[in-house]
Structure formats: structure tokens, C-alpha cells
């Protein structure tokens, strides 16, 4: 909770942008509070970090927040945008019947753990052949988002492990929650 313009406590989300440099050093680039997110919000956040010295972003891993990928491409056009695989999996499994989840996940794992993008596409075709009739919305989501879900295949295994998920920022959020969970309101 934060205090609003009328000094009342309101619930707001805090959006964090964390960068990792070539040496693996992590840095909090910005914390932003907003009532809602969207392209204009993300444009202002990215313009802010650019004005404070960020010259380029090689790879951005996002959880597919509304307007974020477009804003990244607008401010930093050379950036490779990778949608978090873990978020995509969580969103997918919600639509799969519980009795099929274990088998479906085993088949899906063949897609995102493939050795190459080409192999992943073959595995995605296999997934669709096996599960497409039962779960067309899941397959459609993977197909529609494939460019951003498969961007990490162009990098080595070491880089892939860092960028296929938003675990870096999620870990930071866990640390913040530990410190702030007993705090009532931020002013």
C-alpha cells in the first residue's frame, strides 16, 4: 500500500526493471508505481532508464505484460524480446484437464527444452498433433507467441538459462516481500 494524492492508503503495484550486464552483475534500474500498466506507462519507464544512462538492451525477458514488448522495441529497437517460458507454461496448464497435466507437461517439455529452435518447432508440431483437438487454445497461444517464446534458442545454454524465465526479477520480488510484509503503508 502507498499513500495517494489525498493521503489515503491505496494498493498499487510496483514494477521493477532489473538489468544484468555482460559480467553478470545485476542492478535495479528502476522501480515504478502505477495504477495500471500499458504501452504509455512502459514507454515512460524505458525512457527514464535511457535518460539515466542505459544505452541498449541486448535481451529483455518479460512476462508478456500489456504493451511492454512494443515499448521496448520503440525505445531500444535492437532488443531481442523473450517471453518468460514459466509464465507461458503456467498460463497453458490452467486449460489442461488435471488428469492430462502430467503427460501434457512431459510433451510440452520437449518443446521448450529442445536443443534448437528447429527441433522445438518439430516438437510443437508433435504437441499439436497429440493435444490440439483437446486443447486448441493452449496450442494457439504457443503458436501466436512463438517468436517471443523461442528467442532464447539463438543463444548458448548458459545464456538460455538466464533468459528463458523472469526468475531474476521474481527472486528480487521475494526479497522485497520479506522486508516489507509487516509494513502497513509506504508514504
Task: Go through each PLM region and give its residues.
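Acidic/histidine-rich catalytic cores and adjacent linkers
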Residues: 113-187
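Amphipathic alpha-helical transducer elements in NTP-driven molecular machines
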Residues: 11-14, 39-43, 62-69, 86, ...
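Conserved beta-strand -> loop -> alpha-helix junction used to position metal-binding or nucleic-acid-contacting
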Residues: 59-66, 71-109
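Short, well-ordered secondary-structure micro-motifs
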Residues: 6, 72, 96, 152-153
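A generic hydrophobic-helix recognition signal that picks specific residues
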Residues: 56, 80, 160-163
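RNase H-like nuclease fold core
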Residues: 1-62, 66, 70, 75-78, ...
